A protein has these predicted regions:
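Glycine-rich cofactor/substrate-binding loops
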Residues: 90-265
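Internal glycine-rich alpha/beta core junctions
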Residues: 1-121
Length: 265
């Protein structure tokens, strides 16, 4: 909405055509009240700050995830040397500094958002000089946050992915138990609740066997105990827990199948 004509917050005695100036300047129309846009001079900055803070939250989540996956314990990705720095004393260190800075900038964005909200919480009706500082804060926020987008883009572009390690991790810790349960429901008729209880039992039995995925023997035992007359083979049980098979079957919109990921990109 067009604030032109509000003056210092109480309008003017000049006979202005506020609708005309709104049309000429490309606004949808003038503000209905002249006091509101002057009192609320902090609102546009705060709305932008909120959007930037949420964007930074997403980037920080990505940064945190990449840092974790790049550790020796996970070893799923390796950051490019461009995005790492050494230690002040430890020769072997590869500190993920670019990602850590993104996390720090996210905290800064949160602080700026809170500052803007506080600036608007105790104003008098009309003009307040307090809101002059909201202009400086929002410019600082944008300047500090803007580089994070290009940095994260480059991190992803240069990231080395350890597919072998990822596949190994995906095949462990019962990652295919859910897809196995869903397959059982489709083979039924078998209620989802019942199938879940069967697979839960099978997981416990498989854990006792020292397995990282549901074994054919444990699932057969669970089916027998739960009196579920479902015909399965060892091949079925193994096939439905393979990561490649799971991704191939996860084909609805927005899912992580290869086809859908390419569509999103």
């Amino acid at each position: 909405k067009n604030p032109l004509g509000a003056a210092a917050g109480y309008g003017t005695t000049f006979n202005l055509d506020r609708q005309l100036t709104s049309t000429l300047l490309g606004f949808d129309g003038p503000t209905e009240n002249v006091t509101d846009p002057i009192t609320q001079r902090w609102e546009p900055e705060t709305e932008l700050a909120y959007d930037v803070a949420v964007m930074m939250d997403h980037l920080s989540t990505m940064a945190q995830t990449f840092i974790l996956l790049s550790t020796r314990e996970f070893n799923m990705v390796r950051l490019n040397d461009r995005h790492c720095t050494g230690s002040s004393i430890m020769p072997q260190k590869r500190n993920p500094c670019s990602l850590e800075v993104i996390k720090a900038k996210t905290s800064f964005a949160h602080g700026m958002l809170v500052s803007l909200l506080f600036a608007g919480k105790s104003l008098f009706m009309g003009y307040n000089r307090d809101t002059q500082w909201t202009k400086y804060w929002i410019m600082d926020l944008v300047d500090e946050s803007k580089p994070a987008l290009s940095v994260m883009t480059e991190v992803i572009r240069l990231l080395q992915v350890n597919k072998t390690q990822m596949l190994k991790q995906a095949e462990e810790e019962f990652g295919g138990a859910t897809s196995l349960m869903e397959w059982m429901v489709r083979q039924g008729p078998l209620p989802l609740r019942k199938a879940k209880m069967v697979v839960e039992k099978a997981v416990k039995y498989s854990e006792k066997e020292g397995k990282g995925k549901v074994s054919y023997q444990s699932l057969k035992k669970a089916l027998t105990e739960m009196k579920v007359p479902l015909s399965i083979t060892k091949k079925n049980v193994e096939e439905m827990q393979r990561p490649e098979k799971i991704l191939a079957q996860t084909s609805s919109m927005g899912t992580p199948s290869e086809k859908r990921i390419k569509e999103n990109i």
